[in-house]
């Protein structure tokens, strides 16, 4: 009655001498073909979204509902999750992909044509700015700070309690 979402795990164990390595056949890696569909999350960005019925609804050992209620609620959960996801992706995926494409294209253009030339220009100009700043510091700021320091070096405070 419920929607089956689990895949059966089948493994075949053979000794190395049970088949010939020189038979001309290439044996496929079973992990590559565990799912016949295309991997739409190759970098595992959404691996934390594996949400199942047992993750949302759980009955403790001491209290259980009827088996038919549990099976029907599990089936309804899976079907509604499937249908709502498909419904939302039909109406939101294309507009959001369009907006994300425009956003990333704009950011790429700004980075390539404005930000990086500005940074490179600043890096080219910085050595001369550094020389000018060092001269201004040595000529104006250093003597001023030295004079203020000498003025305040003769100040002494004495605290007396009355």
From Swiss-Prot:
<feature type="modified residue" description="Phosphoserine">
    <location>
        <position position="23"/>
    </location>
</feature>
<keyword id="KW-1003">Cell membrane</keyword>
<dbReference type="GO" id="GO:0051480">
    <property type="term" value="P:regulation of cytosolic calcium ion concentration"/>
</dbReference>
<keyword id="KW-0597">Phosphoprotein</keyword>
<keyword id="KW-0963">Cytoplasm</keyword>
<dbReference type="GO" id="GO:0007005">
    <property type="term" value="P:mitochondrion organization"/>
</dbReference>
<dbReference type="GO" id="GO:0006906">
    <property type="term" value="P:vesicle fusion"/>
</dbReference>
<dbReference type="GO" id="GO:0019901">
    <property type="term" value="F:protein kinase binding"/>
</dbReference>
<dbReference type="GO" id="GO:0008286">
    <property type="term" value="P:insulin receptor signaling pathway"/>
</dbReference>
<dbReference type="GO" id="GO:0001935">
    <property type="term" value="P:endothelial cell proliferation"/>
</dbReference>
<dbReference type="GO" id="GO:0070836">
    <property type="term" value="P:caveola assembly"/>
</dbReference>
<comment type="subunit">
    <text>Monomer or homodimer. Interacts with CAV1; the interaction forms a stable heterooligomeric complex that is required for targeting to lipid rafts and for caveolae formation. Tyrosine phosphorylated forms do not form heterooligomers with the Tyr-19-phosphorylated form existing as a monomer or dimer, and the Tyr-27-form as a monomer only. Interacts (tyrosine phosphorylated form) with the SH2 domain-containing proteins, RASA1, NCK1 and SRC. Interacts (tyrosine phosphorylated form) with INSR, the interaction (Tyr-27-phosphorylated form) is increased on insulin stimulation.</text>
</comment>
<comment type="function">
    <text>May act as a scaffolding protein within caveolar membranes. Interacts directly with G-protein alpha subunits and can functionally regulate their activity. Acts as an accessory protein in conjunction with CAV1 in targeting to lipid rafts and driving caveolae formation. The Ser-36 phosphorylated form has a role in modulating mitosis in endothelial cells. Positive regulator of cellular mitogenesis of the MAPK signaling pathway. Required for the insulin-stimulated nuclear translocation and activation of MAPK1 and STAT3, and the subsequent regulation of cell cycle progression.</text>
</comment>
<dbReference type="GO" id="GO:0005901">
    <property type="term" value="C:caveola"/>
</dbReference>
<keyword id="KW-0539">Nucleus</keyword>
<keyword id="KW-0472">Membrane</keyword>
<dbReference type="GO" id="GO:0048278">
    <property type="term" value="P:vesicle docking"/>
</dbReference>
<feature type="modified residue" description="Phosphotyrosine; by SRC">
    <location>
        <position position="19"/>
    </location>
</feature>
<dbReference type="GO" id="GO:0007029">
    <property type="term" value="P:endoplasmic reticulum organization"/>
</dbReference>
<dbReference type="GO" id="GO:0097110">
    <property type="term" value="F:scaffold protein binding"/>
</dbReference>
<comment type="similarity">
    <text>Belongs to the caveolin family.</text>
</comment>
<dbReference type="GO" id="GO:0060090">
    <property type="term" value="F:molecular adaptor activity"/>
</dbReference>
<dbReference type="GO" id="GO:0048471">
    <property type="term" value="C:perinuclear region of cytoplasm"/>
</dbReference>
<feature type="modified residue" description="Phosphoserine">
    <location>
        <position position="36"/>
    </location>
</feature>
<dbReference type="GO" id="GO:0031748">
    <property type="term" value="F:D1 dopamine receptor binding"/>
</dbReference>
<dbReference type="GO" id="GO:0048741">
    <property type="term" value="P:skeletal muscle fiber development"/>
</dbReference>
<feature type="modified residue" description="Phosphotyrosine; by SRC">
    <location>
        <position position="27"/>
    </location>
</feature>
<dbReference type="GO" id="GO:0019065">
    <property type="term" value="P:receptor-mediated endocytosis of virus by host cell"/>
</dbReference>
<dbReference type="Pfam" id="PF01146">
    <property type="entry name" value="Caveolin"/>
</dbReference>
<feature type="topological domain" description="Cytoplasmic">
    <location>
        <begin position="1"/>
        <end position="86"/>
    </location>
</feature>
<dbReference type="GO" id="GO:0007179">
    <property type="term" value="P:transforming growth factor beta receptor signaling pathway"/>
</dbReference>
<dbReference type="GO" id="GO:0001937">
    <property type="term" value="P:negative regulation of endothelial cell proliferation"/>
</dbReference>
<dbReference type="GO" id="GO:0001938">
    <property type="term" value="P:positive regulation of endothelial cell proliferation"/>
</dbReference>
<dbReference type="GO" id="GO:0030512">
    <property type="term" value="P:negative regulation of transforming growth factor beta receptor signaling pathway"/>
</dbReference>
<dbReference type="GO" id="GO:0071711">
    <property type="term" value="P:basement membrane organization"/>
</dbReference>
<dbReference type="InterPro" id="IPR018361">
    <property type="entry name" value="Caveolin_CS"/>
</dbReference>
<dbReference type="GO" id="GO:0043410">
    <property type="term" value="P:positive regulation of MAPK cascade"/>
</dbReference>
<protein>
    <recommendedName>
        <fullName>Caveolin-2</fullName>
    </recommendedName>
</protein>
<dbReference type="GO" id="GO:0044853">
    <property type="term" value="C:plasma membrane raft"/>
</dbReference>
<dbReference type="GO" id="GO:0030674">
    <property type="term" value="F:protein-macromolecule adaptor activity"/>
</dbReference>
<dbReference type="GO" id="GO:0019076">
    <property type="term" value="P:viral release from host cell"/>
</dbReference>
<dbReference type="GO" id="GO:0030154">
    <property type="term" value="P:cell differentiation"/>
</dbReference>
